[in-house]
A protein has these predicted regions:
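Membrane-helix boundary connector in multi-pass membrane proteins
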Residues: 82-100, 117
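Interfacial loop at the N-terminal end of multi-pass membrane proteins
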Residues: 1, 22-45
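Non-cytosolic membrane-interface motifs at loop->transmembrane helix junctions
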Residues: 32-42, 69, 73, 93-104
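Membrane-water interface at the C-terminal end of transmembrane alpha helices
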Residues: 107-121
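Membrane-helix interface "capping/anchor" motifs
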Residues: 62-68
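Cytosolic juxtamembrane helix and N-cap/initiation of the first transmembrane helix
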Residues: 1-14
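Core segments of alpha-helical transmembrane spans in multipass integral membrane proteins
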Residues: 13-21, 38-62, 73-79
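Structural signal for membrane-spanning alpha-helices in multi-pass inner-membrane proteins
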Residues: 19-22, 57-61, 85-89, 112-116
Length: 121
């Protein structure tokens, strides 16, 4: 249970710290990594959904035994994003440097699986 608490606290805090600034970087991202973002609803919606998951990770961290089953969709969230970026990269639609964040998510996905199996039902 201690592993799960630590892993989910770190993931939640990391996510909040990384995602929150994106609310204020809409135009900067378009300039530094063209083309410009053309669908702000998708952009801000993506950030909002990801932040909601960070809150879920922090909730899981408070009581991993009680919220053990929520670890399953948390794993799907992490592996889903990593897999999406990998497919885009293989299609030459993503810069290799963008894979870093997908790699962090896959790492957290593996740690979430570890936490799931180490937390008693």
């Amino acid at each position: 249970m201690k592993v799960a608490k630590i892993v989910f606290w770190i993931a939640g805090i990391w996510g909040v710290l990384v995602l929150t600034p994106l609310y204020f970087l809409f135009d900067v991202i378009g300039r530094q990594d063209p083309p410009a973002i053309t669908h702000p609803g998708f952009y801000y919606g993506f950030i909002s959904v990801r932040l909601a998951w960070q809150v879920a990770f922090l909730v899981i961290a408070r009581d991993p035994v009680r919220f053990r089953l929520m670890m399953i969709p948390a794993v799907v969230e992490k592996f889903g994003y990593g897999a999406s970026l990998l497919v885009l990269y293989l299609q030459h639609r993503l810069h290799p440097s963008d894979l870093v964040f997908g790699g962090v998510d896959v790492l957290f996905g593996v740690l979430f699986l570890l936490a799931f199996f180490r937390t008693s039902a």
